[in-house]
A protein has these predicted regions:
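Exposed, low-structure sequence patches enriched in small/polar residues
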Residues: 1-172
C-alpha cells in the first residue's frame, strides 16, 4: 500500500481510495444440491492509480485490480442447481455501474476529491440461464440463453440476446 493516511474515512478532506468485495454462498437451502451466491464489488474513484505512473497497479497497461476499474460497482446473484447426476442448471444476474476515471488534478488537488459515482458513463445488466449435461468425463452438452444490455448516459441503450448450444471438451 504505497499511499495511506491515518485520517478517518468520514473526513471530507481525506483521499481514502478503497475498494471492497463482499459475498456469501449458501448450499442446500430449501432444496438439495442448490447453491445460492450473492456478491457485491465496489471500487471508489482513483483506486489503482498513483501520481507516479511507475507505481500504478498495472502491467503492460492492464490493471491488476478489479476488471471494472475505478469508480464502479457491481452486484451479482447466481443460482446453481444439480437436479440429477451430471445435470447442472445455472441462473445468473449482474448489474454494473461505471463512472469516469477522473484526472490527476481531481485526485490530488481537489478537496474533497470527487465522490463515488461522479461523471457517470454507463450501466450494464446481464441475465443468463444455462444448462449442461455431462455425457462422458469432461465432455458436456451446453445450452444457454443470455441477455446483455448496455445503457450509456448519452445514447440509447443497446440490448443483445444470445443463444448458445455446444459441445464442450474440458481436459480437467
Amino acid at each position: 500500500m504505497p499511499e495511506s493516511r491515518l485520517i478517518p474515512i468520514s473526513v471530507p478532506k481525506s483521499r481514502n481510495q478503497i475498494a471492497y468485495q463482499l459475498g456469501a454462498s449458501v448450499t442446500d437451502i430449501g432444496l438439495p444440491y442448490l447453491t445460492l451466491t450473492a456478491e457485491l464489488n465496489k471500487v471508489y474513484p482513483f483506486v489503482y492509480r498513483n501520481f507516479l505512473p511507475a507505481q500504478n497497479y498495472s502491467n503492460s497497461n492492464f490493471s491488476l485490480g478489479d476488471w471494472m476499474g475505478a469508480n464502479a460497482d457491481r452486484i451479482e446473484f447466481i443460482a446453481n442447481y444439480h437436479p440429477r447426476a451430471r445435470l447442472n442448471v445455472r441462473a445468473y444476474y449482474r448489474l454494473m455501474k461505471k463512472g469516469g476515471l477522473g484526472t490527476v488534478e481531481q485526485q490530488y488537488y481537489l478537496t474533497p476529491t470527487p465522490v463515488y459515482g461522479f461523471d457517470p458513463q454507463y450501466k450494464t445488466s446481464k441475465i443468463s440461464l444455462e444448462t449442461s449435461y455431462e455425457l462422458y468425463s469432461n465432455v458436456n452438452i451446453l445450452f444457454g440463453y443470455s441477455r446483455y444490455q448496455v445503457t450509456p448516459n448519452i445514447q440509447k441503450s443497446v440490448t443483445s440476446n444470445q443463444v448458445n448450444i455446444g459441445l464442450v471438451f474440458s481436459p480437467y
